[in-house]
Curated annotation (Swiss-Prot):
This is Biotin synthase. It comes from Shewanella loihica (strain ATCC BAA-1088 / PV-4). The gene is bioB. Homodimer. Binds 1 [4Fe-4S] cluster. The cluster is coordinated with 3 cysteines and an exchangeable S-adenosyl-L-methionine. Belongs to the radical SAM superfamily. Biotin synthase family. One of its GO terms (molecular function) is iron ion binding. Pathway: Cofactor biosynthesis; biotin biosynthesis; biotin from 7,8-diaminononanoate: step 2/2.
């Protein structure tokens, strides 16, 4: 299927009808589409590093990085470039093909742009794809990052337009769409998805996917996060989402965005191997490697490696070796990381 053949005119009731399909029918449809466009046993691996943690002025009710909530998170300033490069080297040694850098900002300050551009160009020189998530971007900031070599920019829509106001009040839905427009205009690829399990209805999950699938060009990467409830945030006591509803969201995302990478993001640590296997079958074909996603836990690398072996999956760039060979790779990566003089956060959910 070419980009021109993709649909960009999905109606809400069409997507809701997909969500309502019997599970076997939905999974068959999603997996069939997945096999048409991807190696069904290949998974793209990214590593995500928090380059500036905490003290965000926004009021996103799910986020422990907001300065408005008492979550016990220690804020950190923008970290040194050498620490970023140390983590990037370790990520590459561990098999990651993309390195993502996230900062807890409403938007980057102009004084930080030269520093951010250096980060991008230095990581890019290692032969890895680069991604950043820094909040809202102006047209000029997007162009500067693109000129530095940034491949992807992440800016999630989070949920449907109708439910959005119950989640965030300090940034509008249109603000988010404007940033994505600036990213596209600068020539970068878009990474945009959302979070499920925030008390939304099934129609809101349909609404989120409708917004993404009806963009002039589908996001190249679509992260689907399961809410990680953090003490101190307004959402710490929400009821858990039925895991099968998460699988349905993955499957429908695959159907309406056939050429996009659908990423399992935050919440994987709480998922059973069986649930993750269902998600991969439903069309998920990207994950974050590493023990932490920003301030939330992520499966240990060895756990992911073992699961890949059990399911017969392999990273995007070449098939995995034996368990012993993979352990040697991860040991080498850890040795590189240990050279860093200070600990720092690994990542944030995209």
């Amino acid at each position: 299927m070419s980009e021109l053949a993709l649909r960009h005119d999905w109606q809400r009731d069409e997507i809701e009808a997909l969500f309502a399909l019997p599970m076997n029918d939905l999974l068959f449809k999603a997996h069939s589409i997945h096999r048409q466009h991807f190696d069904p046993n290949e998974v793209q691996i990214s590593r995500l590093l928090s380059i500036k943690t905490g003290a965000c002025p926004e009021d996103c009710k799910y986020c422990p990085q907001s300065a408005r909530y008492d979550t016990g998170l220690e804020k950190e300033r923008l970290i040194e470039i050498e620490k970023v490069l140390t983590e990037a080297r370790a990520a590459k040694a561990a098999g990651a093909s993309r390195f993502c850098m996230g900062a807890a900002w409403r938007n980057p300050h102009e004084r930080d742009m030269p520093y951010l551009k250096d980060m991008v160009s230095e990581v890019k020189a290692m032969g890895m794809e680069t991604c950043m998530t820094l909040g809202m971007l102006s047209e000029s900031q997007a162009k500067d990052l693109a000129d530095a070599g940034l491949d992807y920019y992440n800016h999630n829509l989070d949920t449907s337009p109708e439910y959005y106001g119950d989640i965030i009040t300090t940034r509008t839905y249109q603000d988010r769409l404007n940033t994505l427009d600036n990213v596209r205009a600068a020539g970068m690829k878009v990474c945009s998805g959302g979070i499920v399990g925030m008390g939304e209805q099934a129609s809101d999950r349909a609404g989120l996917l409708q917004q993404l699938a009806n963009m002039a060009k589908h996001p190249e990467s679509v992260p689907i996060n399961m809410l990680v409830k953090v003490a101190g945030t307004p959402f710490e006591n929400l009821d858990d989402l039925d895991p099968l509803e998460f699988v349905r969201t993955i499957a429908v995302a695959r159907i309406v965005m056939p050429l996009s990478r659908v990423r399992l993001s935050a919440g994987r640590e709480k998922m059973t191997d069986e649930l993750q296997a269902m998600c991969f079958f439903a069309g998920a074909n990207s994950i974050f490697y590493g023990c932490k996603l920003l301030t939330t836990s992520n499966p240990e690398e060895n756990e992911d490696m073992t699961l890949f072996k059990r399911l017969g999956l392999h990273p995007e760039q070449g098939k995995a070796g034996t368990v012993e060979e993979d352990k040697a790779v991860f040991a080498k990566a850890q040795a590189v990381k240990d050279k860093a003089s200070q600990p720092f956060y690994d990542a944030a959910a995209l």
